């Protein structure tokens, strides 16, 4: 993974099984105990051989390898337990667990707005509590940035938003600390969308095509799987997205990527947010960028002269097979009633 913003920015420690030294057992020459009367021997020698040395030659290496294996497993368990207890990162079966550590910030080694954005992304991915977040914040500040922090009152140091504004005032562009974000309403169709089958990178995805959503969103788990948690793939999102009930959506950042629908590839801009159970939602922004034509009557989506089948949300499992017929012949005319 690239280290965004400089060396050591986001240290990821995947929990991987180590090769135990017990594998030495496999390298031991195979020794089979055969009763002495059946052993071949040179002519004129007594063929009767004691069985004890043969048994010990087999048992001793086996016991030694077993001892080494148990010792390695015993030594590994505390380390695994410690990582799992301290990482606090999101995990899914079959995926590696990542622990992200912020890069030190001196005030000049990185744009303050970018460093603060990445720090908040790491906070969300690691699921830090308030005390842990403040502890990592203080430990990450160095040089002039630490001087700014130490110049605050103890009450201000306990308020992340206050520390954030102080750092932006000290090292950011004029007026950066007081910029007013644009507010965007995320009013999706509430279960009335359609699925479109494709890929993001190498990962198969079932996109929810939602003409009622103004922005396109992917779940953080999908972003992490495709990018291996590369924070350099995220850029700050400076606006505010609110859902129908008025709550503010937590946005990790903007992800510029490419989606594949059959052989058709499309550039897409997604907000990375845990907004719903859907792994990816294609909103009107992406649809308009590529002049998509949705025909809900015939359940098709036309993009770049090609039609793709849509599956309504809530359809039976048997209808899932329709998604395999993702792409029709190029040049087929669009059905009447397309809009």
UniProtKB/Swiss-Prot annotation:
Keyword annotations: Aspartyl protease, Autocatalytic cleavage, Glycoprotein, Hydrolase, Membrane, Protease, Transmembrane, Transmembrane helix
Enzyme Commission identifier(s): 3.4.23.-
Propiece span(s): 1-188, 325-339
Induction of synthesis: By 12-O-tetradecanoylphorbol-13-acetate (TPA). No TPA-induced expression is seen in mice lacking Fos.
InterPro entries from the UniProt entry: Aspartic_peptidase_AS, Asprv1, Peptidase_A2_cat, Peptidase_aspartic_dom_sf
Name of the protein in question: Retroviral-like aspartic protease 1
Gene field: Asprv1
Region (Disordered) residue spans: 34-53
Organism this protein belongs to: Mus musculus
Top EC class of this enzyme: hydrolase
């Amino acid at each position: 993974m690239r280290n965004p913003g400089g060396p050591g920015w986001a240290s990821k420690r995947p929990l991987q099984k180590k090769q135990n030294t017990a594998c030495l057992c496999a390298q031991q020459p195979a020794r089979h105990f055969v009763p002495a009367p059946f052993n071949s021997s040179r002519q004129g020698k007594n063929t009767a051989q004691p069985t004890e040395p043969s048994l010990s030659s087999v048992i001793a290496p086996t016991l030694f390898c077993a001892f080494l294996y148990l010792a390695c497993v015993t030594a590994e368990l505390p380390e695994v337990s410690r990582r799992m207890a301290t990482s606090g990162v999101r995990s899914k079966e079959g995926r590696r667990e990542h622990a992200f550590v912020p890069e030190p910030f001196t005030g000049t080694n990185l744009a303050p707005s970018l460093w603060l954005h990445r720090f908040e992304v790491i906070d969300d991915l690691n699921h830090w509590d308030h005390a842990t977040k403040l502890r990592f914040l203080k430990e990450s500040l160095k040089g002039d940035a630490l001087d700014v922090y130490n110049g605050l009152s103890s009450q201000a140091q306990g308020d992340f938003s206050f520390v954030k504004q102080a750092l932006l005032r000290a090292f950011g562009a004029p007026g950066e600390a007081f910029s007013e974000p644009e507010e965007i309403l995320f009013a999706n169709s509430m279960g009335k969308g359609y699925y479109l089958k494709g890929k993001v990178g190498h990962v198969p995805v079932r996109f929810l095509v939602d003409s009622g959503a103004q922005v396109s969103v992917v779940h953080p788990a999908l972003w992490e799987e495709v990018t291996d948690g590369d924070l350099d793939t995220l850029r700050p999102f400076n606006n505010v997205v609110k859902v129908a009930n008025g709550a503010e959506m937590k946005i990790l950042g903007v992800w510029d990527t490419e989606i594949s629908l059959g052989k058709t590839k499309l550039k897409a801009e997604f907000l990375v947010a845990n907004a719903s159970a859907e792994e990816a939602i294609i909103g009107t922004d992406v649809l308009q960028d590529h002049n998509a034509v949705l025909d809900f009557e015939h359940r098709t989506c036309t993009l770049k002269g090609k039609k793709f089948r849509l599956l309504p949300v809530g359809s039976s499992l048997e209808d899932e097979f329709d998604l395999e017929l993702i792409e029709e012949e190029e040049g087929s005319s669009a059905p009447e009633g397309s809009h």
